[in-house]
Amino acid sequence: MSTEIDQPFVVEEILTIIKEAVEISLQNTVYQHKQVPQWTQSIIDHSLKKISELNNKSYKYIVNCLIFQKTGAGFHTASSCLWDSANDGSCSYRWENKSMHCIISVFGCKI
């Protein structure tokens, strides 16, 4: 029987949440520079709210969201940190449409 403290970082649950957040916020949108701050905040807020509803109080979560216009140029992104690989976790989700890219990363650090 696992306790709340023993719960692992479950990538599949987190991915479902961030995919939903992106679809809700960006579905049927066209890139507009002035809207990016609202879109990123909406995605982050929705993700954190749903992640907190998982009731896994043994983690602190960090959510990062990048939205940028498709211009034909390539891009590369990477994240790195020093942590306990046995207990901490992370996942990322990449979404795109005809006018923009969106990359969301979630880090779960066990307390």
From Swiss-Prot:
InterPro entries: Tctex-1-like, Tctex-1-like_sf. Belongs to the dynein light chain Tctex-type family. GO terms for cellular component: cytoplasm; cytoplasmic dynein complex; microtubule. One of its GO terms (molecular function) is dynein intermediate chain binding. This is Dynein light chain Tctex-type. It comes from Dictyostelium discoideum. Its main location: cytoplasm. It is found in: Cytoplasm, Cytoskeleton.
